[in-house]
Amino acid sequence: LATLTDVAKKANVSKMTVSRVINHPEQVRDELKELVYEAMRELNYRPNAAAKALANKRTQIIKLLILEEMDTTEPYYMFLLTGIANELDKYAYSLQLLTRNNVQIGDSDGFIVCGMRKEDEELIKNLDKPVVLFGHNEMGEDFIDSNNEQSMAKATQYAIEEGYENIVYIGIDIDEPFAHAREKGYTKVMADNGKEACTYTLGNRSRYSAAFIKEHWNEFQKNTLFLCASDRLAMGVVREIKEQNGNIPEDYGVIGHDGVFLDQIAHPHLTTLKQSITEMGAACARMVLKKVNQDGKPQGNQLFETELKRGGTTR
């Protein structure tokens, strides 16, 4: 088995540096940390988590608290968990998965919280450890999220440049920052281009968007693009346009948001705004560990840009 001395030799650093990378990574430069991590990977060196926890008076556990219902039909949380777990593993940390009913079971060094809504503010405030939220919030907590406003602004500008005469926004009917930001990105670009915004909000289910298209089909002229706040909504729109014998993408365009899985099983594949879910998961892990190592010092927020991924639903 490889030892700490072996890692130090491989990375061409002192044993003290290796120990500091393992126990106090916030005190080491990123380039030096990567050298040590690379040596640890090559030698398959695993720090003794129990010894590390004892030395630091810590549990070496981060809790992931998921406050919304997880949908087993799409791997959104699988990508997020992969990013968090892989990053925590670099620092000899374990991940404990929780729901709102078992928040206080066991001890930990910090929390990553997903799916928080406004009614959860009191629950978050009562957590007695450093907290990082996955998703924009307005209660002053540190968070990681996509740049939702810029994401929809980019898609709206793309639709205009592709020559779509009418651009209809179908948002998610929820009073949360991410939903407002996405709609704002659309309305701002429409106004900047002298176009009239046309917005609707629906529950985030494909059957709702399909029913909406069916009900309003005669109101939508050819050369209309439907900009949807989720791939779920986009799938329902595509399905019903085809049901109404509309031509996609020649006469009607559709853009979704998320790019996790549903865009690939839609026919044709959706043009969508792909979020960097795994990378954002890793960023959540880095931020909460930094916060733990700095005695809860606020870390601010980090926004990730989305990628406009072209499929078969736009020209």
Label every model-predicted segment.
Residues 214-315:
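Flexible loop/turn connectors
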Residues 76-90, 154, 177-196, 236-240, ...:
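Short, solvent-exposed amphipathic alpha-helices that sit
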Residues 144-170, 179-181, 188, 206-214, ...:
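Hydrophobic alpha-helical segments within soluble ligand-binding/sensing domains
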Residues 81, 88-99, 169, 187-207, ...:
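Short beta-strand elements in bilobed, periplasmic/extracellular small-molecule ligand-binding domains
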Residues 165-167, 196-197, 248-253:
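Short acidic capping loops at alpha-helix termini that bridge into adjacent secondary structure
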Residues 2, 61-157, 216:
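Alpha-helical recognition/docking segments in bacterial nutrient-uptake
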